[in-house]
Amino acid sequence: MYINGQWVKSQSMKTYMDYSPVNDANYAEIYDADRNDMQQAIDAAHKAFPAWAALSPEERADYLLKVADALEKNGDEISKHLIEEIGSWVGKSKADLTTSIAFWRAGAKIPFMVEDEILTSPIGKKSMVKRSPLGVVSVITPWNVPLNLSSRTTSGILAVGNTVVLKPSEESPITGGIVLAKAFEDAGVPPGVFNVVTCSRKHVAEVGDEMVSNPLIKAISFIGSTTIGRQIATKAGSLFKKTSMELGGKDALIVMDDADISKAVTAAAFGAFFHAGQICIGTKRIYVDQKIATEFTNRFVAKTKALGIGDVRDFAKPIGPLINPAALEKIKQQLNDAIDKGASVLAGGKHEGLYFEPTILTNVTKEMDTYGNETFGPIVAIYPYTTIAEALQEINAVDYGLSGAVMAGSDEKAMKVAMQMESGMCHVNDGTIYGEPLAPFGGMKNSGMGRYGGKASVDSFTQQRWITVEQGTRHYPPMFNE
């Protein structure tokens, strides 16, 4: 663990084993923190906050750029950890590293986006709005793209002057936190500005509770399941603390009648099966105009069956393992439930160990668990539609709204549909998986609240203060005058 600029053991000296789905074996021994360790990290971040907040935008930007350089320098080692610890395909590991570095370099622009405002005011009064950082921010990140999401969130939070305590997922303590802490150490970032606390599932509840309830914590950033996000939001709300959350998704791709089918198949395959479908913005539903549904489906099935499954160190085999046996069981339950209730399997449906075949379903109905609930694995359903209004009604009826995509013959036609999709993000003539470092990233409905990136990070992780200066012309009632 990394607390106050030092590598420390858990106070209890307890450890847990970090599991590798690639090798189906333990990967590393990790210190297992409890509430006391998190309190220590929060205290360190609190003490570091005044000096960090007082730095100029140029000084904070310089530190963030040094973090990016340190990640780049250690890139080969980090990529190896991404493959071994969470089962990233080698192509994904390189992409995760590249995008993570980009978040820190883009984050160096965010300090300059914090703008004060001068308000029109009565004569004799100077009125202004000042933005200031919040203080210590708790950051909780998931295992599926750990370095990417830890970088996406913390870069903006630190850029505007806050300090951070980060708890990576128990499934990805190395790639979600430890390698990032090493970059902060190498970059010479002042002690206490960025702290990493690791823990096992056994201690998640107490450590997480401390990250919300500790009075020194001023805001919480959480990326993970909607169920846990709701619990955190409820507790934080009772304490009047700001929250920003990116939660589950049930993201839809619409393929209109004049879409380029080849591009649509490519976008669908990447969106549905990248990282074995373990992506929050991955494609889980494909709505295809019935006029082209047969051709699209046939070509999509052929592409899906051709995808390589196996050793993720091999660039030709992009479909790797699910993260753990519990994830496998959940996917199997959703698939069996769908089949038992009448769904048809057009491709896949089998597994060998944690390696689950890319799977395509049709005839999925509302009674099936996979219809409206998040599916965190390589299963996608195809829904032919008659009218776009019908497709939009079904898409928007689901409680999630993270990402979406529309494929059509013209951008204008697709844009009209995109504007009617209830999702925080939507991509025209592209797939659901896409991001840019300074763009606002986040969802609506049960997919979260708040945004990350660029000016959105400024809005989410600073507070407005109204300051006035009286210049001697205000008149009080005479009985109050001295």
Language-model segment annotations:
Residues M1-K125:
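N-terminal Rossmann-like NAD(P)+-binding subdomain of aldehyde/semialdehyde dehydrogenases
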Residues P21, R35-M38, P57, G75, ...:
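Residues at or immediately preceding the N-termini of alpha-helices
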Residues D24, R60, L82, G161, ...:
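Residue-level signal for inorganic ion chemistry
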Residues A25-E29, I217, I254, G308, ...:
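Conserved C-terminal structural/oligomerization subdomain of aldehyde/semialdehyde dehydrogenase
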Residues N26-A33, A48-A54, S138-V139, L253-M256, ...:
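Short, well-ordered beta-strand elements within core beta-sheets of diverse protein domains
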Residues F49, A53, A68-G75, S79, ...:
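Structural signal for hydrophobic packing residues in well-ordered secondary-structure cores
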Residues D116-K263, Y385:
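Rossmann-like NAD(P) dinucleotide-binding subdomain of oxidoreductase/dehydrogenase enzymes
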Residues G188, A219, T227-T365, I388-A389, ...:
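ALDH superfamily catalytic-core signature
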